[in-house]
Amino acid sequence: MDEVGKFWQAVWDEMGVVASEKASHPVAENAPMFPPAEWFVGARLNFAENILHFGKDEDVAVIACTEREDDTQRTTYGDLRKQVAQAGHALRSLGIKPGDTVASYSGNTCENLVAFLAASAVGAVWTSVPPDFGTAGVLERFTTVRPRVIFSTNQVLYNGKLHDHIGKLNATIEGLLACLLYTSDAAD
């Protein structure tokens, strides 16, 4: 390709990327493969804003299925935008700000997608573990990133049966609190 920068600028423009600050240039024309080049230098954008920007309010944005054949949930762009805005507002009201970590101990559901997009919308770092992780595995992940908020499910559908998830969640929270209350080796 002779004009790499022009090509990628055309892709950016054609895709309608929403950015609060435009890039000074897409990429240097003669950028080497290694070390990797800087792309779209100076651009500032939000992933969630770009995901939610497209689609008419009445169009289906998400089709979520479970292992039950008759359990399919459809969510429109309008509903998704509204739910993400509400969840984002709730996160902000809890003091979540850019750079804070928000976690999920839940499955791949529409509700979890809403939580992820809301966290992204406020600029938070997102991490998640599936509900089949045991408490030790969740604590190993979460104590490293120290989430300020954890989204979780209260029950899990597995092999046709609903399983309570609250016990594992409570054990995780207790383990995190024990880890997070430790502040110093200094004596009082």
Kindly give the residue locations of the regions a language model identified.
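Phosphate-binding active sites in nucleotide-utilizing proteins
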Residues: S106, S128, V149
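Active-site diphosphate/adenylate-binding microenvironment
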Residues: S20-G42, N108
